[in-house]
Structure formats: structure tokens, C-alpha cells
Design a protein with these regions (language model features):
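Extracellular/periplasmic carbohydrate-active domains that bind, remodel
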Residues: 1-241
Length: 241
């Protein structure tokens, strides 16, 4: 509790943008996020009984708070401000990923991608791990700048279910309720309960996109590359579903 974490992310934003200029023309948009290796602001992985409260996060290199393969985590009263001294790419707010029994409350997020987001792994690796995101409550929260007050996906392979979100406000957020995935992801989204969601100046209140961002979501090795001579994590991404 109490304090500020400055991720000093600009150096990583600049690195990512530089790599995009190199990778995109080669048909490698799908792997650049992984090759860039941008750090998260806070990563809670394989943990139980964790509380994060009353802190301020800003300028992360990548996602601000990532809860991964964890359970019994409470996030209470945090502020995320990712638009100080620039706007970093894909600087999500809170990402709850293949985790369960999570409570997020009394938090305020301004970011440059999804504000409050649920994920469950992607593609063949997500199907292999097969860990759902479930039993999550998000309440009494505000989203300002960002791409999704409440988002499911695009990583949906393990499934997302038994989610409750209420007393949430989007103020100038690009999207309100956003569900996104692709045919490569798989997984089922079900039993999502949303109540008392207020949107002020939100461009699109409700969006469902099941062919989200094909250049990023579809992993394909361009001509001229030999699968025997690429990094191991490329092979994992290239494994067909």
C-alpha cells in the first residue's frame, strides 16, 4: 500500500515502435510484441492470497498490472495513469489472466489499451495450458482514457466464465463493453454478469469482434525464413491449433 511505481516505460515504447517499423513490412507483426520483451509494471504469477492496494502506477513498459495463473488476489484502491509524459502502446490497465477468485475494486485507470481486461491464454499454448479465467468480481471502478472499460480477450483459449462486474463508469473510454477473439484462439466466454455500467462520452458502448486484428493474431512464417533457424518461442507461436 501507498506509494508510486514509475515504470519509466518510454525507452521500451521507443524500442517497440522501432521494431514495428522493421518487423511489420516483413510480415512479422505477430511476433514483435514477444521479441521486444517489454516489462510489465507489476506481475503477479503463480501466487495465492495477495493484496495490492492504495498505490499509483504509471509509465509501464507494457501492461500495468498482470495477474497470471493466480488465485485469491485482491486489488483495491489503485490508480493507473499511463498518459503522463507520452502515451505508450498496449499499456493495458489491469489484466486478469487464467486466474480465479479475484476481486478488483475502487480503482481508477487511464491507459492506452484495455482498462479492465480478462484473458485466458492464446492459441495452441493456451489450449495446452487450459486454465480458465473465472470467479472474478470487478466493482466500483472508473475508466478514463483507454480502449475498453470492461474487456474479455483477445486471449480466450482457456475460457472465461463466472464474471461479475458492477458499478463501473467509463468516461471518454473508446469502447465500453468489449469482447474480442479470433478463430485461432478458441475457448468459451459464458456467465458474464454486468450491472449498473455507466458510460459518458464512450464512442462504442458494446463491441463484439471475433476476427480481431488478423495481422497480429495470425502467426505465419514469411517466405525466406526457415523454421529450423528461428527462436523457440516463434515455434510455439507457429504451432497450429
Amino acid at each position: 500500500g501507498d506509494g508510486v511505481i514509475n515504470g519509466r516505460g518510454k525507452v521500451f515504447w521507443d524500442k517497440y515502435r522501432s521494431m514495428r517499423k522493421e518487423y511489420d513490412p516483413k510480415g512479422l507483426r505477430w511476433i514483435v510484441d514477444y521479441d521486444c520483451e517489454r516489462p510489465r509494471g507489476i506481475l503477479i504469477a503463480e501466487c495465492e492470497n495477495v493484496t495490492v492496494e492504495n498505490i499509483v502506477l504509471y509509465q509501464p513498459g507494457f501492461w500495468s498490472l498482470h495477474i497470471l495463473y493466480s488465485k485469491y488476489v485482491t486489488v483495491d484502491g489503485i490508480i493507473i495513469s499511463n498518459n503522463i509524459e507520452g502515451r505508450g502502446p498496449s499499456t493495458d490497465g489491469i489484466d486478469i489472466d487464467s486466474s480465479e477468485y479475484i476481486l478488483v475494486q475502487n480503482s481508477n485507470i487511464n491507459c492506452n489499451d484495455d482498462n479492465f481486461c480478462l484473458k485466458a491464454g492464446r492459441d495452441s499454448d493456451g489450449l495446452r495450458v487450459n486454465r480458465p479465467c473465472r470467479y472474478v468480481v470487478i466493482r466500483d471502478c472508473i475508466a478514463g482514457h483507454g480502449d475498453g472499460l470492461f474487456t474479455c480477450g483477445s486471449e480466450t483459449s482457456g475460457g472465461i466464465n463466472n464474471i461479475v462486474a458492477y458499478n463501473m463508469t467509463g468516461m471518454g473510454t473508446k469502447y465500453g463493453l468489449r469482447f474480442k477473439s479470433t478463430c485461432q484462439r478458441g475457448g468459451v466466454i459464458e456467465d458474464i454478469y454486468l450491472c449498473n455500467i455507466e458510460m459518458i462520452g464512450v464512442r462504442d458502448p458494446f463491441v463484439v469482434d471475433l476476427n480481431w486484428h488478423p495481422a497480429y493474431s495470425t502467426s505465419k512464417l514469411p517466405e525466406g525464413y526457415d523454421e529450423k533457424n528461428v527462436p523457440t518461442h516463434w515455434i510455439k507461436m507457429l504451432t497450429p491449433v
